[in-house]
């Protein structure tokens, strides 16, 4: 008995000592953070900083260490990892199934690996997805041009433009044409108007993420500057705050500033007309698009050739995060998106109608915040900044790493403050999780592509039947009504697979939820194929066969690098779209394709050796 009491006492003592040591370390950490903050406040000349000039070069004069780190993104050599990196190869070449999943949508033509926050506006202005003439000439005749809403997360000038051009009207800002809004970015800090520098990424029109997006110029405290994020957080149960955007602790803010953009979103129609800035080019009958219709904007970053601003009316829309079903304090679940998008279906039915199946498809965008919320790191109070912007030493200073990159680039700083295992062990654990999720991802995508091809086949067969025709031709509405259950399964299956595909951690932020979504996607795709067989039989089509496409089948959809197929805007057919950027839209490294081939089906003998 006495021995048991002694043992229990020893255990309690050890736990108390461990607790005291942890508490002491936590207190010291907070003291060091506070001392660091006070040192910054004492040495920084905040009078030089203002929201009227968000140029990171200007802010960097006050915070040179942080600017130096941020600009490494511009200069670093392109590299790849199994599921990331900063080499902007074509993801359509690596994953040809995406051309089928997104058939009828601009992403099916141009989609490259991301290359860092510095490049977000450069790449947004260059992508073929923002080139009306190119898209109209290459199979997407209905594309009318991107709205300025796309600038919310691509341009550090967004708050300035909302205030000074849209006069504080967020709806008007979002509803203005992208290229029209770009023309209004001012020349600051000695930059000559309409010069190459004015067009460039260092404070000019191609400037991406900047300091002011996340920091208050008065004291560098964290804040939210994007109205869509603030509105969405309020819909979840947060309270507005005039300084921070919403009331939240500093630790919460270290995630919420990232949640301004690393989220799912859509452009919600207001149902009303709104007055916005347009362009007088619409009145010049000599200016035509490639298809011969009248130009209503000039796809160029400067005002030129007499083109000027004019007030016009257009359909109103607001950048919206679909979060009202996801309440504060809850982990996100994919069914919350089902519920949300079902409720707004009368206002917003889909991002696009699938070209092959006719399904109403929601195109998911970078939902890192949603997936992370239910993961083990979020449950333990770990913020985005803790992993992606860890503390590092710059001489005697302790600063957050501002190149904003994968934790695997600096495991010692990002991971080992909590995890005591070796760097090799931790890296292997991450890769093992990502390989597992990637297997589920490929399985789901191949299953959905199989469903798509089978649906297209049955649509064609039904279209030959008189009861599915009008005026002797296949009636798409009648066929879609017959296939409505299948089309709904396609919509929801693709939403799940697209969610994990668009979320940039290959499931690492929450592997359980990622795999749950993907298994649902596989199940829905197979259920859809079963229903196709039933519908075929009910309409007298015997022995309708469904498909089961694999890696080799999928490679047949490889689109290759992006080229002009016709003469457009002084570009000749056969010219490479990214002719001036050799590292963009090229083939992925061969070893990545070999790795993908072993994932579905999962070849453990090859993968485990890595």
What are these regions (language model features)?
Residues 96, 116-142:
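Short linear recognition/processing motifs and adjacent strand/loop elements at protein termini
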Residues 1-15:
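N-terminal Sec-pathway targeting helices
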Residues 135, 140-162, 166, 174-175:
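A cross-kingdom signal targeting lumenal/periplasmic-facing segments of multi-pass membrane
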Residues 4, 137-139, 199:
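N-terminal catalytic scaffold of extracellular/periplasmic and nuclease hydrolases
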Residues 588-610:
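Extended, compositionally biased alpha-helical segments that mediate assembly or anchoring
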């Amino acid at each position: 008995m006495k021995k048991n009491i002694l043992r229990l006492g020893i255990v309690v003592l050890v736990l108390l000592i461990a607790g005291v040591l942890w508490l002491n370390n936590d207190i010291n950490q907070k003291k060091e953070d506070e001392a660091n903050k006070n040192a910054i406040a004492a040495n920084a000349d905040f009078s030089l900083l203002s929201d009227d000039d968000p140029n990171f070069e200007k802010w960097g004069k006050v915070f040179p260490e942080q600017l130096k780190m941020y600009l490494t993104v511009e200069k670093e050599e392109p590299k790849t990892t199994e599921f990331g990196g900063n080499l902007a190869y074509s993801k359509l070449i690596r994953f040809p199934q995406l051309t089928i999943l997104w058939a009828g949508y601009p992403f099916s033509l141009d989609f490259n690996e991301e290359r860092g926050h510095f490049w977000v506006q450069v790449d947004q202005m260059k992508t073929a997805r923002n080139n009306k003439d190119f898209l109209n000439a290459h199979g997407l005749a209905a594309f009318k041009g991107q709205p300025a809403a796309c600038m919310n997360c691509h341009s550090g000038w967004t708050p300035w433009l909302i205030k000074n051009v849209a006069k504080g009207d967020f709806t008007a800002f979002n509803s203005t044409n992208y290229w029209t809004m770009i023309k209004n970015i001012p020349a600051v800090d000695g930059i000559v108007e309409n010069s190459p520098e004015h067009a460039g990424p260092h404070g000019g029109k191609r400037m991406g993420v900047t300091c002011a997006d996340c920091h208050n110029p008065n004291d560098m405290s964290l804040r939210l500057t994007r109205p869509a994020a603030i509105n969405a957080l309020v819909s979840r149960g947060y309270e507005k705050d005039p300084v921070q955007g919403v009331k939240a602790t500093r630790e919460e803010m270290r995630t919420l500033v990232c949640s301004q953009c690393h989220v799912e979103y859509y452009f919600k129609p207001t149902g009303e007309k709104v007055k916005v800035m347009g362009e007088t080019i619409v009145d010049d009958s000599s200016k035509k698009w490639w298809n011969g219709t009248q130009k209503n904007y000039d796809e160029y970053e400067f005002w030129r050739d007499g083109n000027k601003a004019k007030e016009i009316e257009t359909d109103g829309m607001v950048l919206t995060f679909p979060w009202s079903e996801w309440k504060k304090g809850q982990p996100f679940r994919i069914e919350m998106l089902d519920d949300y998008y079902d409720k707004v279906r009368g206002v917003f039915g889909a991002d696009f109608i699938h070209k092959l199946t006719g399904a109403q498809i929601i195109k998911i965008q970078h939902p890192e915040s949603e997936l992370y919320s239910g993961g083990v790191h979020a449950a333990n109070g770990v913020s985005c900044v803790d992993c992606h912007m860890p503390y590092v030493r710059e001489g005697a200073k302790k600063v957050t790493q501002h190149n904003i990159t994968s934790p695997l680039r600096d495991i010692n700083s990002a991971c080992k403050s909590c995890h005591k295992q070796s760097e090799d062990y931790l890296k292997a654990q991450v890769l093992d999780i990502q390989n597992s999720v990637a297997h589920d991802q490929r399985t789901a995508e191949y299953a959905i592509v199989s469903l798509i091809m089978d649906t297209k086949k049955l649509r064609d067969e039904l279209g030959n039947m008189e009861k599915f025709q009008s005026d002797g031709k296949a009636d798409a509405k009648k066929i879609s009504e017959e296939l409505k259950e299948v089309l709904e399964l396609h919509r929801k299956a693709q939403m799940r697979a697209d969610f994990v595909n668009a979320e940039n951690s290959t499931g690492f932020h929450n592997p359980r939820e990622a795999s749950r979504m993907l298994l649902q996607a596989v199940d829905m795709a197979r259920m859809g194929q079963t229903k196709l067989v039933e519908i075929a039989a009910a309409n007298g089509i015997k022995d309708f066969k469904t498909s089961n496409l694999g890696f080799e089948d999928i490679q047949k959809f490889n689109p290759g690098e992006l080229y002009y197929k016709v003469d457009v805007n002084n570009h000749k057919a056969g010219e490479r779209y990214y002719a001036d950027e050799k590292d963009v839209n090229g083939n992925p490294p061969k070893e990545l394709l070999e790795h993908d081939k072993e994932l579905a089906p999962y070849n453990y003998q090859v993968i485990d050796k890595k």
